[in-house]
């Protein structure tokens, strides 16, 4: 098993909590971890996924680097990795 941390900011922090430790099977990707996270945090699925796909407007960071949904499906996780979630930016 691989232990990672999921951190949430802004509106997501209110919905999901600030920090969630998560154990995923070895070889899991960022996308796999987010699917598992959505199963453990009830409000996460509706906010992060649409029709089983990660919503494109969710801002993802992986170990302090911004990634997109396609990257999330390819990046393998290691112990201690961090995934950060930001809601879409809006306003003016």
Feature roles, as predicted:
Residues 1-91:
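Ubiquitin-like/PB1-type beta-grasp interaction modules and other compact soluble beta-rich domains
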């Amino acid at each position: 098993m691989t232990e990672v941390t999921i951190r949430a900011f802004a509106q997501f922090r209110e919905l999901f909590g600030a920090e969630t430790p998560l154990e995923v099977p070895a070889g899991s990707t960022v996308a796999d971890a987010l699917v598992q996270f959505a199963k453990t945090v009830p409000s996460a699925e509706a906010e992060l996924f649409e029709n089983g796909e990660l919503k494109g407007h969710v801002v993802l960071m992986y170990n302090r680097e911004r990634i997109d949904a396609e990257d999330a499906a390819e990046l393998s996780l290691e112990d201690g990795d961090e995934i950060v979630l930001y809601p879409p930016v809006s306003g003016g």
